[in-house]
Design a protein with these regions (language model features):
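Retroviral integrase
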Residues: 8-9, 38-196, 231-259
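Surface-exposed, charged/polar loop-rich segments
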Residues: 180, 187-233
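Short amphipathic alpha-helical interaction elements and helix-loop-helix interfaces
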Residues: 24, 28, 36, 145, ...
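Generic alpha-helical structural element
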Residues: 3-7, 19-23, 176-179, 183, ...
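Residue-level marker of conserved, structurally anchoring positions within well-ordered domains
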Residues: 1-51
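Terminal peptide-recognition signature
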Residues: 18, 91, 225
């Protein structure tokens, strides 16, 4: 049997509290965030101690059952002289009946999400395409404002996207659609991760989410996922840091859990 000091237990409790503020990542992912971030009041060892003392975080398990020294300032990435070309894989996701458009930039794996009109499914096809086009252009504009150049948008055979393709091409965007029913795998994996994390957050709450809170919870989950360093990343930095230039900060980024 292993024994822990009072200080070790207190840090383990703090680590478990911050895990909720991160949207319930698994412990290994949380360790990556802490190791590459700043201003955390605990270390990766404290996360491991928390798993030994309390067991693995239950909400992070249940959410997936369905299928570093303090710095005085916030470091911001200086934009490159030349825009970086990106491919953006996109798809439409439904959470609690609410439609979202999800975009994943490659090779940065930065996730973008926008909620569509809640009456999206009841709209005529022409109106649906206008809603989708507006959301896509907002995402593209956000990337261009950070000196990135989305040169290719990849979709599956969504009818709403097919109808707005000419308008997107007129604005200089190349749209590539895969065969109908052949979903873009990178987006499918991301959507699965978003839904798993959303379920973990939902299970931690003592109340039912309204439509507005559902949107806010999805945005919260995506924000947390963008702070997570991919296991296959060669640079060792999070997607948020790669795009926004903001290093993960334990003091400012995880003050509160959702709800």
């Amino acid at each position: 049997m292993r024994f822990f000091t009072k200080a070790q237990v207190e840090k383990a409790v703090k680590a478990r509290q911050v895990q909720a503020s991160m949207g319930f990542p698994v412990s290994s992912a949380m360790q990556g965030i802490v190791d590459r971030g700043v201003n955390f009041q605990f270390t990766s060892q404290d996360i491991r101690n928390a798993d030994i003392i309390f067991g693995s975080e239950p909400n992070s398990r249940r959410g997936t059952t369905a299928w570093r020294q303090a710095m005085t300032g916030i470091p911001i990435r200086q934009p490159d002289a030349q825009p970086q070309n990106l491919e953006v894989a996109m798809d439409i996701m439904f959470v609690n009946g609410i439609p979202f458009i999800v975009g994943v930039t490659r090779p940065l794996n930065y996730i973008m999400v926008g909620d569509l009109d809640k009456t999206y499914e009841t709209k005529a096809p022409a109106r649906q395409s206008k809603i989708v086009e507006k959301s896509i252009l907002e995402m593209v504009g956000s990337l261009k404002s950070r000196n990135f150049n989305p040169i290719l948008l990849t979709w599956d055979g969504e009818k709403a996207v097919t109808q707005c393709t000419p308008a997107l091409q007129f604005k200089g965007l190349q749209v590539q659609q895969v065969a109908a029913g052949a979903h873009v795998s990178v987006v499918e994996r991301v959507i699965r991760s978003i839904k798993n994390r959303f379920r973990a957050v939902l299970l931690s709450l003592p109340y039912v989410l309204t439509a507005l809170l559902t949107v806010m919870a999805v945005l919260f989950v995506v924000r947390c996922l963008n702070m997570q360093v991919s296991a296959t990343s060669m640079s060792g930095i999070s997607p948020r840091e790669a795009v926004q230039g903001l290093k993960t900060n334990g003091k400012t980024d995880f003050r509160f859990s959702f709800g």
